[in-house]
Amino acid sequence: MRKSIFIVSILASFVLFFSCTADITLTEQKDGSVKVLFSGRAGDEFNKLINGNNEGSLIDVKQISYQLEKAGFYDVKVTNDGIKDVKISMLDKSKSSYIFTSGIVSSKMDLNINKENLRKFYDEADEQTRLILDLLIAPIFNGEEMSADEYVELLSSVYGSAVAEEVQKGFVNISLVNSSGKKSSVKIPVADLLCGNAEITF
């Protein structure tokens, strides 16, 4: 049995951690549900950008849990391992959550990053999330067409080279594991993701 999994907003949900490195693993369970594991770390410069000189965390564990449960996930567990680190595990049992839709064909898992749905996530996000995402001035959320290099240059002109370099060096690592244990992985540059230039299927 094949499960086609379309990521529509999970990447946007966690984009505030992506100025460094984030890892997302999607594992198809024997019962057809999908287990999602996420770990991410906010970059130092981006953390300063959001929090200013405050030493507090930009991670609201209760709010993240609430939003994910509201999106249709089960068994949501969010842990905050410091000011900038977060780990999340959750389960999509219904196969009809806001994040995923599923289809049956043969025996592998597919991934598609869809920028239209990322924009939809932004439009439907709560005010606090939108304010954070607005700080990224990301083309994916404002509808502008821009290359990754142009976007990094824009960040540099607005926030300085340190923030721009942090985003430029950031990657999102995504792994899919089907019910037979076969694993596929892809590494996506953060700048490409935020420009909407990462519509990848594998």
Regions found by a protein language model. Name each.
Residues 36-39, 48-52, 98-101:
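Short, hydrophobic/aromatic beta-strand segments
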Residues 1-4:
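Positively charged n-region of N-terminal signal peptides that target proteins for export
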Residues 41-71:
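Post-signal-peptide N-terminal segment of Sec-exported extracytoplasmic proteins
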Residues 10-13:
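Residue-level signal for mature regions of secreted extracellular proteins and peptides
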